[in-house]
From Swiss-Prot:
Lineage: Bacteria, Bacillati, Actinomycetota, Actinomycetes, Mycobacteriales
Keyword field: Aminopeptidase, Cytoplasm, Hydrolase, Manganese, Metal-binding, Protease
Superkingdom of origin: Bacteria
UniProt GO BP: proteolysis
Protein name, UniProt field: Probable cytosol aminopeptidase
GO MF: manganese ion binding; metalloaminopeptidase activity
Encoding gene, per UniProt annotation: pepA
């Protein structure tokens, strides 16, 4: 019997429901406000008569509400509205309102309501799906592994008021809920400490989660990896007592016409290996499996949403540790498929496990291959903490980057210059895992991975070294620590491909 593992803590506890009327016994009502040319504007809710709407507006104005983006103003309730208090959430200029502005506002509102039991909101009138996502993800509260629950607890329940078509509202609500839950799963996995999440336990958690929704699951242990020649994964994982794994997930709906392979880096902890990282900030390396968590969440979301696309996810899992058996600078390894690589720096390990996984995924001959990783510090230097770098086949690369910006997960297309590709070549092997230059590190990693993509496959590589893990303050619906970026981007990419 296989060992049983589970995540030590999760962060999404808020209940979501849809209603056509204001429920009884709610604590608060959240309403949208706008910044108009002449001051505060209050969107009519359709729940109350004009006099009550004006009374709400009067009180909001009296306390200085402006309707600007990011504003959250709490006022006492008024006679005739059976709630304890009312919250006005600023959406800015009505003419420039977009989904992510709404999503951020809902996240701001949810965070301000921590500890409240039950609220209702009319924010969904301007976009039910982004309102649902924003509230759920803004309320996300990962308290960690504690002997006693940390207070205040997150917002307990949100009722979304929808006065429109019931069927359409239900569909939009469900999509938002599934996507929010998938992002939360990604966050939970990334937030889990490496003492609890390591290759064996992680593979088991993926298996148990995936099997519940009917995905196909295959797990290769270290013996099968060695037998099949996964030299990159084995090299990285050999220094740890916690041996590597490779997980394969499959979603194969009927009548799907196209296929995509997903690959995500799963380094459950990265010390840098023999090329040891500095001690300061090394604890953040629990997040070095953010790419794998993204792809697990993405394929699960695709299955739950019924996306008509054949999807496989190939997830390499390893822990990069120094030790008597660890791989060394100067080693030459043979990847799955036969390409050899000179190791110049053991802290450039992510591309080694990805290379094996990409080569294996390419054997399935998918139409598209999408891989993601917290891969290079160079991504943060070039694009900052919130914008992902996207490389690969021109058309698919640009499509992925545009989709990210469209859904509110900033991404930017990056080139793969020929001269950097030349620098990836090795004098003693086919390629080397770093170049001799500090320049263009993000693109050098992209070039390295390109050698393993099968011929004729449209490919995109997304570097999320900064965006996957928020070390600064909370903003909108983004908490500290794991962000869940870019799950929403990838779910939309898959949906777009299925509809083509």
């Amino acid at each position: 019997m296989s060992a049983q593992f589970s995540l030590p803590a999760t962060g999404l506890a808020t209940q979501l429901e849809l209603s056509k009327k204001l429920p009884e016994d709610i604590d608060a009502l959240v309403v949208p406000t706008f910044k108009g040319e002449d001051g505060l504007e209050l969107a009519a809710s359709g729940l109350f008569d004009e006099n009550l709407e004006i009374a709400i507006w009067d009180l909001l104005v009296a306390v200085g509400a402006t309707g600007k983006q990011g504003e959250v103003v709490r006022i006492p309730s008024i006679e005739g509205i059976e709630v304890d208090f009312i919250v006005g959430v600023g959406l800015g200029d009505n003419d420039s309102l977009d989904d992510d502005t709404l999503r951020r506002a809902a996240g701001d509102a949810a965070r301000s309501l921590a500890g409240v039991q039950h609220v209702a909101t009319t924010l969904g009138a301007f976009g039910l799906q982004p309102a649902v996502e924003g509230f759920a993800l803004g309320a996300y509260n990962y308290t960690g592994v504690r002997s006693k629950q940390k207070k205040p607890l997150p917002l307990e329940k949100v009722t979304f008021i929808s006065l429109g078509d019931k069927k359409a509202a239900k569909e939009e609500f469900t999509v938002g809920q599934i996507i929010a839950e998938s992002v939360a799963l990604c966050r939970d996995l990334v937030n889990a400490p490496s003492s609890h999440l390591y290759p064996e336990s992680y593979a088991a958690i993926i298996r148990d989660t995936a099997e519940k929704i009917g995905l196909g699951v295959e797990i290769l242990d270290e013996k099968k990896l060695e037998k099949q020649g996964f030299g990159g994964i084995l090299a990285v994982g050999t220094g740890s007592s916690r041996k590597p794994r490779l997980v394969r997930l499959t979603w194969a709906p009927k009548k799907a016409k196209k296929s995509i392979a997903l690959v995500g880096k799963g380094i459950t902890f990265d010390t840098g290996g023999i090329s040891l990282k500095p001690g300061a900030g090394m604890d953040d390396m629990i997040s070095d499996m953010g790419g794998s968590a993204t792809m697990v969440a993405t394929i699960i979301a695709a299955a739950r949403l019924g996306v008509k696309l054949n999807v496989t996810a190939t997830i390499p899992l390893a822990e990069n540790m120094p030790g008597g058996n660890a791989f060394r600078p100067g080693d030459v390894i043979t990847h799955y498929g036969g390409i050899t690589s000179e190791i110049l720096n053991t802290d450039a390990e992510g591309r080694l496990v990805l290379a094996d996984a990409i080569a294996r995924a390419s054997e399935d001959k998918p139409d598209y291959l999408l891989n993601v990783a917290t891969l290079t510090g160079a991504q943060i230097v070039a694009l900052g903490d919130r914008t992902s770098g996207v490389m690969g086949s021109d058309e698919f690369r640009d499509s992925v980057a545009l989709t990210g910006r469209t859904v509110g997960e900033p991404a930017w297309a990056m080139p793969l210059p020929e001269e950097i590709g030349e620098d990836v070549k090795s004098p003693v092997a086919d390629i080397r895992n770093v170049t001799g230059s500090r320049s263009g590190g993000m693109m050098a990693a992209g070039w390295y991975l390109s050698h393993f993509v099968g011929e004729g496959i449209e490919w995109a590589h997304v570097d999320i070294a900064g965006p996957a893990y928020n070390k600064a303050g909370v903003y909108g619906y983004i908490p500290k620590r794991a962000t869940g970026v870019p799950v929403r981007t990838f779910v939309q990419v898959l949906s777009n491909l299925a509809e083509q």
